[in-house]
Amino acid sequence: MTNSDGTGRFIVFEGGEGSGKSTQATRLAERLGAVLTRQPGGTELGGQLRSLLLDSDAMVSDRTEALLMAADRAQHADELIRPALAAGRHVVCDRYTGSSIAYQGHGRGLDPADVAMLSAWATDELSPELVVLLRVDQDTAA
């Protein structure tokens, strides 16, 4: 789906592991005919960074992890999200800045304000128009 004014809408799903965000993001993207993407891993570079970050043998420091996530987000915004929006396409993204604030900020003990600032700089302040936060209890997520 595209907008007649030439600008797409940017929608992000956030939530803990097992909250259903990937399922709901997929459903919404299909319903809207939108571009579906995720972070990390929405681009070729992002896929490589995702593999590195998920590799339990990789000895990545907390700050390095935050910087790699910001690098993924910068590439993702420039290569995929902005061009799609400019073409009038809606973009639905599974995770975005909120996940970095949660995982690298609160989870890794980095200053959440620093993580937010880094993400804003990496994306040149590209913000979603809507963030859907899915919250479920641990029993539901398990």
Annotate each language-model stretch with its function.
Residues 93-95, 124-142:
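Conserved phosphate-donor/acceptor-positioning beta-strand/loop module used by diverse small-molecule
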Residues 18:
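Walker A (P-loop) phosphate-binding loop of P-loop NTPases
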Residues 30-34:
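Conserved phosphoryl-transfer catalytic core
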Residues 24, 28:
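Hydrophobic positions on the alpha1 helix immediately C-terminal to the Walker A/P-loop
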